[in-house]
UniProtKB/Swiss-Prot annotation:
The gene is lexA. This is LexA repressor. It catalyses: Hydrolysis of Ala-|-Gly bond in repressor LexA. Its EC number is 3.4.21.88. Keywords: Autocatalytic cleavage, DNA damage, DNA repair, DNA replication, DNA-binding, Hydrolase, Repressor, SOS response, Transcription, Transcription regulation. Belongs to the peptidase S24 family. Transmembrane segments: none annotated. GO terms for molecular function: DNA binding; serine-type endopeptidase activity. The record marks A123, G124 as: Cleavage. The active site is at S158, K196. InterPro entries: LexA, LexA-like, LexA/Signal_pep-like_sf, LexA_DNA-bd_dom, LexA_repressor, Peptidase_S24_LexA, Peptidase_S24_S26A/B/C, WH-like_DNA-bd_sf. It comes from the Bacteria. Residues 26-46 bind DNA. HAMAP family: LexA (MF_00015).
């Protein structure tokens, strides 16, 4: 049985992963739970890990995975969904060629959306512009939401502190605008594609890595075109 703070943190991590595909930072978790220090977050995460609700990926910064949600919680904390069943994660089959939802009794659980994989994207030094379609993935619609989508295979380690690792597959919603702080696919000078966090500095655009080994790159607005925004991530073990 979870305490209120443990339950609140687990739900916050779960909702952030659903929305963005990457876990929240310790500062974001501290603010969300109105705690004064990160040590309290460390204790809560350790308790959730010991109880089998989350998993920390070793030697990787900011890498948390929700394994399950509780079937029972402390009195007064349960929502109808959490009280009735546990978490049903997406199951990624071996080749990443197909993705299917875990078993669920909900109507329409077997439906999928076909998403094209448009080659590789650099999470490091920019590489050549996005390639043509290489193959497709079948994605549960609840992972996507509205709009048009495509997927890219990540190469490089510049976004590791955002929980995005070399070899991951990122799900991108097509768009040509984004808010500062969003993780985007940026096309630089119509030649180089890169996955970075968007920062707007006056009339300039900054592409910020999530790895201190990489410098933030700043461009004039006419040199960068936004191709899409990160909405999810898939990883093969």
């Amino acid at each position: 049985m979870l305490t209120r703070k443990q339950y609140d943190l687990l739900r916050f991590i779960h909702e952030r992963l659903k929305e963005t595909g990457v876990p929240p930072s310790f500062d974001e978790m501290k603010e969300a739970l109105d705690l004064r220090s990160k040590s309290g977050i460390h204790r809560l995460i350790t308790a959730l890990e010991e109880r089998g609700f989350i998993r920390r990926l070793p030697n990787r910064a900011r890498a948390l995975e929700v394994v399950r949600l509780p079937d029972s919680v402390a009195p007064g904390l349960a929502t109808p969904r959490s009280a009735s069943r546990g978490f049903s994660p997406s199951v990624i089959e071996g080749s990443l060629g197909k993705v299917r939802p875990a078993a669920d009794d909900d109507e329409g659980a077997g439906q999928v959306v076909t998403v094209p994989v448009m080659g590789r994207i650099a999470a490091g030094s920019p590489i050549s512009a996005i390639q043509t379609r290489s193959h497709t993935l079948n994605i549960p619609p609840e992972m996507l939401g509205s709009g048009e989508h495509f997927a890219l295979e990540v190469r490089g380690d510049s976004m590791i502190e955002a929980g995005i690792l070399d070899g991951d597959t990122v799900l991108i919603r097509k768009c040509d605008t984004a808010d500062t702080g969003d993780i985007i696919v940026a096309l630089v000078d119509d030649e180089e594609a890169t996955l970075k966090r968007l920062r707007k500095k006056g009339a300039s655009i900054a592409l910020e890595a999530a790895n201190p080994a990489y410098e933030t790159r700043i461009f004039g607005p006419d040199r960068v075109r936004i191709q899409g925004r990160l909405i999810g991530l898939m990883r093969r073990y």
